[in-house]
């Protein structure tokens, strides 16, 4: 699972990363062909990433992220008109993405070089982890390392590469989202006062592998 971060210019982002000694791949154009189309449409996005194995003396992202530019906003307007941006659980957007890492300080150095700004510290007792928040537009990336060898986060890292362990999704109607989640899972979801507002939590067993926090401001 990867996090794609929307940027205003893939070209400018790639140029900046190169000045910071990153082994950059892209900008690479991409598009989707609809059924029946025989000719690829013009590029609908441009993506920028770093090499999986950076060249000697070069940097690369070791958490699963990439940058993406959508040259035109027409796709979103069309999707909204077709109702494809509306969700039965009233989800508005993914506000925060939580990454399980071995060494927060090391990741912070790399991501600061990439232009991200570090924010507050964060302790997550449920995962037995602590770390730092990084600002990402109107949302956040949260880097977490294990606080003890038997923690939930440490168990995750024993079977995975560094990656996304949890998401915080904002909803417009928490009660409706909670009712829908309880109906689908067959279990009761208790609410709590979370970092971003009143929240409830879905376990990885119900979400194909990640903790999913839903909250309402």
Each predicted region: which residue ranges?
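Glyoxalase I/VOC metalloenzyme domain signal
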Residues: 1-120, 127-217
